[in-house]
Swiss-Prot record:
Source organism (scientific name): Mycobacterium marinum (strain ATCC BAA-535 / M)
Keywords: ATP-binding, Chaperone, Coiled coil, Nucleotide-binding, Proteasome
Family annotation (SUPFAM superfamilies): P-loop containing nucleoside triphosphate hydrolases
Pfam families with a match to the protein in the record: AAA (PF00004), Prot_ATP_ID_OB_C (PF16450), Prot_ATP_ID_OB_N (PF17758)
One of the record's GO molecular function terms: ATP hydrolysis activity
Disordered, as annotated region: 1-25
UniProt entry tagged with the keyword S-adenosyl-L-methionine: no
Protein role: ATPase which is responsible for recognizing, binding, unfolding and translocation of pupylated proteins into the bacterial 20S proteasome core particle. May be essential for opening the gate of the 20S proteasome via an interaction with its C-terminus, thereby allowing substrate entry and access to the site of proteolysis. Thus, the C-termini of the proteasomal ATPase may function like a 'key in a lock' to induce gate opening and therefore regulate proteolysis.
Coiled coil: 19-96
Assembly description: Homohexamer. Assembles into a hexameric ring structure that caps the 20S proteasome core. Strongly interacts with the prokaryotic ubiquitin-like protein Pup through a hydrophobic interface; the interacting region of ARC lies in its N-terminal coiled-coil domain. There is one Pup binding site per ARC hexamer ring. Upon ATP-binding, the C-terminus of ARC interacts with the alpha-rings of the proteasome core, possibly by binding to the intersubunit pockets.
GO cellular component terms listed in the entry, alphabetical order: proteasome complex
Protein name (database record): Proteasome-associated ATPase
Residue sites binding ATP per the record: G296, C297, G298, K299, T300, L301
HAMAP family: ARC_ATPase (MF_02112)
């Protein structure tokens, strides 16, 4: 072993502190190694007495063993030193005084800042590690024991909720109202006033969407002591009731309602697209449209298509790209608009129309759609357990009248009990246009089926073979056969026998209660049967028999639906108007005559009869 290697093996690093015992042990090892070196040199040197080769090997092995022990001891000492340093850092950390937090109020050119902390407003210095230019008003900062700003945090995420009354002229302050109707002026934190944030700002404060403009009625997260509003809190109850969307439904997706679509286009699109002509003829555009008719016949679908078509038409008029056409469809969930607290329903209605006005002020068409309109705007005075309609209806009337001088907004209502809606809403000047969405006849049913049974669907090889592989001819024949079966006045299609108050009787078939939703359900059943057939037989494709079987199943599911307790009320909802019905008897095969029930007294007819 060379001298350098020996010194490295038995040496100690300069920066390693050793105890007295460790030093003594190392010194003993050095002396012993020196003696061994002398013995080795005397054994192999030119003047020494020759010794046996075995003694030389023993001495070398002894030296290697001592070197290994010394190296292991050095590693142990290094690990112990590292542990001592880590413990010392932990002790120093635990012994540090507590840090305080405050809200940044403002910054100054001399690298000082105003901070609100512990109920006081103080001017403090900043650590050199803090970039003053990145600090933002309302931000939380950490202070050391000397009240020096040492760290910048995010904005406060908890606090009191206050309602915004208005934003003041400077744009940085706002008037808010607390829970006890206490008004106060607060500063708006940076996220509420800045449209973009600089690079290097904390990621928690960056958002892909720029903050929208604050509007009266917004809920704000406020620290009343510091006098700052940090965040706009979405109103869950209003967000749930109003769905802002750009509908992707077009008129081409709707079948069997050509005449009704033409009516609503005349009522809605013409005033928007040809405003100059309307002004020239001094013609006031309609404020609203009522779509009424039986359930499942496409009222909501038409309303969505109106918003989609209107956006594209206005984009064409302006010369914009129709693919980037923008419109808003505010879909109001009628029954959920009702609230047990006095004044809440009216407040929701005000907020809905306020949002519509804001969207329309940007030049974008806005459709405010009230589904199930009869549930919230029924005739005043008809309530049994509640008189909420006495205030809700006037609120809607005032909002509709307020739309008079506002462009790009139209109200569309949908109901299957238009007779229950308050007459003041339906009068000319409010919901001017009334369009009845009727049940589809055989011709309309073929049009609806063609929307669902397209040439892209897989068709069974046997059915295609009947038409020499002509897929369009096969699909057309399928539609004709299924419509003939659905609209045939045969015994299997007999549904009800109704008795009117004057004693007349009438037999009703399933076709009298058909709807677009039922047709879609028939097609969906057939497609499911085709999938099951593929799994069972391995032969893919839709067959006419799948459609015919689906009609039978659909009719069977509907045989128990007629309400025999209040037959006239049920008939009105189903779209049957005219003479009052007092008796219903089901005619479906296998049904017992006990399923029918006569209504003889006026007291049992319900509140609408």
């Amino acid at each position: 072993m060379a001298d350098s290697e020996r010194s490295e093996a038995f040496g100690t690093p300069d920066d390693t502190p050793l105890s007295s015992n460790d030093a003594a042990e190392l010194e003993q090892l050095r002396r012993e190694a020196a003696v061994l070196r002398e013995q080795l040199e005397s054994a192999v040197g030119p003047q020494g007495t020759a010794r046996s080769a075995r003694d030389v090997h023993q001495l070398e092995a002894r030296i290697d063993s001592l070197a290994a022990r010394n190296s292991k001891l050095m590693e142990t000492l290094k690990e112990a030193r590292q542990q001592l340093l880590a413990l010392r850092e932990e002790v120093d950390r635990l012994g540090q005084p507590p840090s305080g937090y405050g809200v940044l109020l403002s910054t100054h050119d001399d690298d000082t800042v105003d901070v609100f902390t512990s109920g006081r407003k103080m001017r403090l210095t900043c650590s050199p590690n803090i970039e003053i230019s990145l600090l933002r008003k309302g931000q939380t900062v950490r202070l050391n024991e000397a009240l020096t700003v040492v760290e910048a945090g995010t904005f406060e995420s908890v606090g009191e909720i206050s309602t915004l009354r208005e934003v003041l002229a400077d744009g940085h302050r706002a008037l808010v109202v607390g829970h006890a109707d206490e008004e106060r002026i607060v500063w708006l934190a940076e996220p509420l006033v800045a449209e973009d944030l600089p690079d290097g700002f904390p990621d928690a404060l960056n958002d892909d969407t720029k903050p929208r403009k604050l509007r009266p009625g917004d809920s704000l997260l406020v620290d009343t002591k510091a006098g700052y509003a940090f965040e706009r809190i979405p109103k869950a109850e209003v967000e749930d009731l109003v769905l802002e969307e750009v509908p992707d439904v077009s008129y081409e997706d709707i079948g069997g309602l050509t005449r009704q679509i033409e009516q609503i286009r005349d009522a809605v699109e013409l005033p928007f697209l040809h405003k100059e002509l309307y002004r020239e003829y001094a013609l006031r555009p309609p404020k609203g449209v009522l779509l009424y008719g039986p359930p499942g016949c496409g009222k909501t679908l038409i309303a969505k298509a109106v918003a989609n078509s209107l956006a594209k038409k206005m984009a064409e008029v302006r010369g914009d790209d129709s693919r980037e056409a923008k419109s808003y469809f505010l879909n109001i969930k009628g029954p959920e608009l009702l609230n047990k607290f006095v004044g809440e329903t009216e407040r929701h209605i005000r907020l809905i129309f306020q949002r519509a006005r804001e969207k329309a002020s940007e030049g974008t068409p806005v459709i405010v759609f009230f589904d199930e309109m009869d549930s919230i705007f029924r005739t005043r005075g008809t309530g049994v357990s509640s008189d909420v309609e006495t205030t809700v209806v006037p609120q809607l009337l005032s909002e509709i009248d307020g739309v008079e001088g506002l462009e790009n907004v139209i109200v569309i209502g949908a109901s299957n009990r238009e007779d229950m809606i308050d007459p003041a809403i339906l009068r000319p000047g409010r919901l001017d246009v009334k369009i009845k969405i009727e049940r589809p006849d055989a011709e309309a049913a073929q049009d609806i089926y063609s929307k669902y049974l397209t040439e892209t669907l897989p068709v069974h090889a046997d059915d295609l073979a009947e038409f020499e592989g002509e897929r369009p001819a096969c699909i057309k024949a399928m539609i004709e056969k299924v419509v003939d079966r659905m609209y045939a006045e045969i015994d299997d299609n007999r549904f009800l026998e109704v008795t009117y108050a004057n004693g007349d009787k009438e037999v009703m078939y399933f076709k009298d209660f058909n709807s677009g939703a039922m047709i879609q359900n028939v097609v969906d059943r057939a497609k499911k049967n085709a999938i099951k057939s593929v799994l069972e037989t391995g032969q893919p494709g839709l067959r006419i028999q799948h459609l015919l079987d689906s009609i039978v199943d659909e009719f069977a599911e509907n045989e128990d639906l007629p309400n025999t307790t209040n037959p006239d009320d049920w008939a009105r909802i189903s779209g049957k108007k005219g003479e009052r019905i007092v008796y219903i008897r089901t005619l479906v095969t296998g049904k017992s005559s006990s399923a029918s029930r006569a209504i003889d007294t006026e007291s049992n007819l319900g509140q609408y009869l």
